[in-house]
């Protein structure tokens, strides 16, 4: 019974695709759109920010992946935390994160943002930005290269395609 159903479904898909129709799930379309139109907001705190700027320049060109840097957290859906996060800067990081619209993602760039890095034992350094905001992707290195950042962004795109779903809560909109 099950095999017969899947064979009929496959025949229908083939017949419709031959006529120029595309069959997919809404979740797949939303995942594709979200992953290919990330708008990062920079949170450059130290030398990793220079590599982040290089990744956006003409040699690597993050625009080809659909990424456009935005100056405001309200227009962004991705925060790239690049560099050493101090205890004084941690509340500002959280405030900016809270201002971002849903769905939102965070990429931690460099050893300092990932775990404190060279300054791990300093009294004034947060030992990883994941103590302040939830992190989706970690990019290692001191500082990580522009290629490493782009690879991390591509991994985030894969994660978004895998995990995204269309969620609508009618109670929130009334």
From Swiss-Prot:
Keywords: 4Fe-4S, Cell inner membrane, Cell membrane, Iron, Iron-sulfur, Membrane, Metal-binding, NAD, Quinone, Translocase, Transport, Ubiquinone
Main location: membrane
Required cofactor names: [4Fe-4S] cluster
Top-level EC class as recorded in UniProt: translocase
InterPro entries cross-referenced by the UniProt entry: NADH_UbQ_OxRdtase-like_20kDa, NADH_UQ_OxRdtase_20Kd_su
A GO BP annotation: aerobic respiration
Catalytic activity reported: a quinone + NADH + 5 H(+)(in) = a quinol + NAD(+) + 4 H(+)(out)
Top-level taxon in the UniProt lineage: Bacteria
Tagged with keyword DNA-binding: no
Residues the entry annotates as binding [4Fe-4S] cluster: 47-48, 112, 142
Cofactor note: Binds 1 [4Fe-4S] cluster.
Entry-linked Gene3D superfamilies: 3.40.50.12280
Topology versus the membrane: Peripheral membrane protein
GO molecular-function terms, A-Z: 4 iron, 4 sulfur cluster binding; iron ion binding; NADH dehydrogenase (ubiquinone) activity; NADH:ubiquinone reductase (non-electrogenic) activity; quinone binding
EC number(s) on file: 7.1.1.-
Similarity comment: family membership: Belongs to the complex I 20 kDa subunit family.
Function, as annotated: NDH-1 shuttles electrons from NADH, via FMN and iron-sulfur (Fe-S) centers, to quinones in the respiratory chain. Couples the redox reaction to proton translocation (for every two electrons transferred, four hydrogen ions are translocated across the cytoplasmic membrane), and thus conserves the redox energy in a proton gradient.
HAMAP family: NDH1_NuoB
Record-given protein name: NADH-quinone oxidoreductase subunit B
Organism expressing this protein natively: Rickettsia bellii (strain OSU 85-389)
């Amino acid at each position: 019974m099950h095999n017969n159903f899947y064979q009929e479904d496959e025949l229908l898909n083939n017949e419709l695709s031959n006529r120029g129709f595309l069959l997919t799930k809404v979740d797949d379309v939303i995942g594709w759109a979200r992953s290919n139109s990330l708008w990062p907001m920079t949170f450059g705190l130290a030398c990793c920010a220079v590599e982040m700027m290089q990744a956006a320049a003409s040699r690597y060109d993050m625009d080809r992946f659909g990424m456009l840097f935005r100056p405001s957290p309200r227009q962004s859906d991705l925060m790239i935390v690049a560099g050493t996060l101090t205890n004084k800067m941690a509340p500002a990081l959280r405030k900016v994160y809270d201002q971002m619209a849903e769905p939102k993602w965070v990429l931690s760039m460099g050893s300092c943002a990932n775990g404190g890095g060279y300054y791990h034992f300093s009294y004034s350094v947060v030992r990883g930005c994941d103590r302040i905001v939830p992190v989706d992707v970690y990019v290692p290195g001191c500082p990580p290269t522009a290629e490493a950042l782009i690879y991390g962004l591509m991994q985030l795109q894969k994660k978004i395609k895998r995990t995204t779903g269309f969620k609508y809560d009618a109670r929130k909109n009334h």
